[in-house]
Regions:
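Alpha/beta catalytic cores of group-transfer enzymes, especially the acyltransferase/condensing modules
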Residues: 43-45, 72, 131-279
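Short hydrophobic targeting helices and cationic amphipathic motifs
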Residues: 16-19, 27
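Non-catalytic positions within long, well-ordered alpha-helices that form the structural scaffold/packing
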Residues: 110, 211, 292-293
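A short, acidic, amphipathic alpha-helical segment used as a generic capping/interface helix at domain edges
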Residues: 280-296
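Short, positively charged and aromatic/hydrophobic N-terminal segments
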Residues: 24-32
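FabD-like malonyl-/acyl-CoA
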Residues: 35-171, 217, 221, 298-324
Length: 324
């Protein structure tokens, strides 16, 4: 018969410490980690009056808006605060305006402590500033150059985009491949929602075939060109030089990029991915899936609108969503 006896009093502390370590090691795989991911919107979320309340109520925001007027060479604040929808739709205004609104919100928010970040298309530049990779001035300068380069590319190659609702990604890809014209997937927004990009004739043909294949909607978009497609090659070449000569810093947290839905701590890789973004699809579905797999429990949209929150709920239904 074996009788267990407690250790002598002098050894009780070491015994309990040892027992505690064993229990901790046993429970370690089940430790709950609650990580926050901040996500930044792209073009299309602009609205008249955006940022005006921030300008009037916060000195940090006011200083950043005034600095933006200097960097851009025109008073973007006048268009953002009082411009009409047509003025806001101008590419030279839209992209800097959304970037400004997003980055300034992140700057003035006391709760902004991201564990990881990502941005949809244009929003990737906001994410790079928020993670310390780019300075505010350099980020804004690149966004301005991106907007102008894309506008020129649209003038060279008249083109458009369309939203396809209700078909799986593989079916959309197959239809795009079957068309003897430039038509490619541009935004993998969420399951059952994919935006295609290409020539006007190619998009018209694609919309007809998508509808015949069972798409609930095949909706041409009111945009100036085929973003995230080979037709943006002139803009990619133009922006490449600007990105390569801009100083990039090591990110303070993981930045998930559009072209591969992954993050990198290597500056050269971040630059290469950012250059490729203009002619490559935005892999948003995979980005959110990867962020969730790697610990993100709450996705916080930082910028105008709530479009990204809706996409997250469709991609990762168990995740929490919020906005600032």
């Amino acid at each position: 018969m074996h009788v267990w006896c407690p250790p002598a009093k002098s050894g009780i502390d070491s015994f309990l410490n040892s027992l505690g370590r064993k229990i901790s090691l046993f429970l370690m795989p089940y430790k709950i980690i609650f990580m926050k991911a901040y996500i930044f919107p792209g073009q299309g979320s602009q609205f008249s009056g955006m940022g005006k309340d921030l300008f009037e109520s916060n000195s940090i925001a006011k200083n950043l808006f005034e600095k933006a007027n200097e960097v851009l060479g025109f008073k973007i604040t006048e268009v953002m605060f009082a411009g009409n929808d047509e003025e806001l739709k101008q590419t030279r205004v839209t992209q800097p305006a959304i970037f400004l609104h997003s980055v300034i919100l992140a700057n003035i928010s006391e709760s902004f402590k991201p564990d990881m970040v990502a941005g949809h298309s244009l929003g990737e530049f906001s994410a790079l500033v928020a993670s310390g990779v780019l300075s505010f001035e350099d980020g804004l300068s690149l966004v301005r150059k991106r907007a102008m380069a894309m506008q020129r590319a649209c003038e060279i190659n008249p083109s458009t985009m369309a939203a396809i609702i209700g078909l799986d990604d593989k079916k959309v890809e197959d239809i795009c491949d079957s068309i003897n014209d430039i038509v490619v997937p541009a935004n993998y927004n969420c399951p059952g929602q994919l935006v295609i990009s290409g020539s006007k004739s190619g998009i018209d043909r694609a919309c007809k075939l998508m509808t015949e294949a069972g798409a609930r909607r095949a909706l041409p978009l009111n945009v100036g060109g085929a973003f995230h497609s080979p037709l943006m090659e002139p803009a990619r070449v133009e922006l490449e030089a600007a990105i390569l000569e801009t100083n990039f810093n090591k990110p303070s947290c993981p930045v998930y990029q559009n072209v591969n839905a992954k993050h990198s701590m290597k500056i050269d890789e971040i630059k290469i991915n950012l250059i490729a973004q203009l002619t490559s699809p935005v892999r948003w579905t995979q980005t959110i899936q990867n962020m969730a797999k790697e610990g993100a429990k709450e996705f916080i949209e930082c910028g105008p609108g709530k479009v990204l929150q809706g996409l997250v709920r469709k991609i990762s239904p168990d995740s929490l969503t919020a906005s600032i």
